[in-house]
Design a protein with these regions (language model features):
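Residues that scaffold, gate, or flank divalent-cation-dependent active/transport sites
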Residues: 1-249
Length: 249
């Protein structure tokens, strides 16, 4: 814990059982997928990154969703703190959006992340159980002799079955906590992410050079073109914003 009742997690997919009942400050985007995971982990309240807001306001869609479950939530601006880096959100993040429950506790746009998190310690624990996640991994193409193409809502869904395949991921294109070794769990043939608005320190595209170093072709789609947290939207709607040298070759 950074302070009593507050935990920092670079990704909402990497939480601990003892986190339940605490306020989460996470580097994850504020979309529906991440919000569902925060609710299922039984956090008291949560602060995400707004991921550039993006198409259909997907980067903050989790705020209203969590309010419906009785959870106070907010986002920091993508230009104030690196997405994928909870420590940076805590250190210099500025609140960009809040839901009604967070506002009732004194959270407001323009606040420091740390100040907002302290307000959120007074939140009531959500009573509603979040619904089960729908299918979040989709096989898009499977032709004999060709690599398979997968659409995945989260990078956490990448596994051994995707070695040598193409993965189109709804997650942001940032390395978690600034650690290049965390860019991709396996050696895929190619990977595409959401650029989350690119943001401060160009964090939203920082996986690209990290994957270059491993010889993996990688690209991002613009947050304004595809819903973050939605692999199928990456596939169907995404417009490339950046490519790494391996992909460009």
């Amino acid at each position: 814990m950074i302070e009593p009742g507050i935990v920092l997690r670079d990704s909402v997919t990497k939480t601990e059982a003892e986190d339940a009942g605490r306020v989460l400050v996470t580097g994850s985007h504020g979309g529906l997928y991440a919000a569902n995971l925060a609710a299922r982990a039984r956090f008291r309240a949560a602060i995400f990154n707004d991921a550039g807001i993006g198409k259909a306001r997907a980067g903050i869609a989790g705020l209203a969703y969590l309010e419906g479950l009785g959870m106070a939530a907010a986002t920091v601006g993508f230009e104030s703190a690196r997405i994928g880096d909870a420590g940076d959100a805590w250190a210099r993040g500025t609140i960009s959006h809040v839901n009604g429950l967070a506002a009732d506790l004194g959270c407001a746009p323009g606040q420091d992340c740390a100040e907002a998190a302290r307000h959120l310690r007074a939140a009531r624990m959500p009573e509603s159980e979040p619904p089960a996640l729908e299918e979040t991994a989709h096989l898009i193409a499977s032709e004999p002799g060709a690599p398979r193409v997968w659409a995945l809502d989260s990078a956490s869904l990448v596994g051994p079955e995707h070695v040598g395949q193409i993965v189109l991921v709804g997650s942001h294109g940032a390395v978690l906590g600034g650690r290049p070794e965390a860019a991709l769990k396996i050696d895929a043939l190619a990977a595409v992410y959401n650029d989350a608005g690119i943001g401060i320190d160009e964090a939203g595209v920082s996986r690209l050079p990290a994957l270059d170093a491993r010889g993996i072709a990688a690209a991002t789609v613009a947050a304004a073109s595809a819903r973050i947290g939605d692999g199928l939207s990456t596939y169907r709607d995404g417009v490339l914003s950046r490519v790494n040298a391996t992909a460009a070759a």
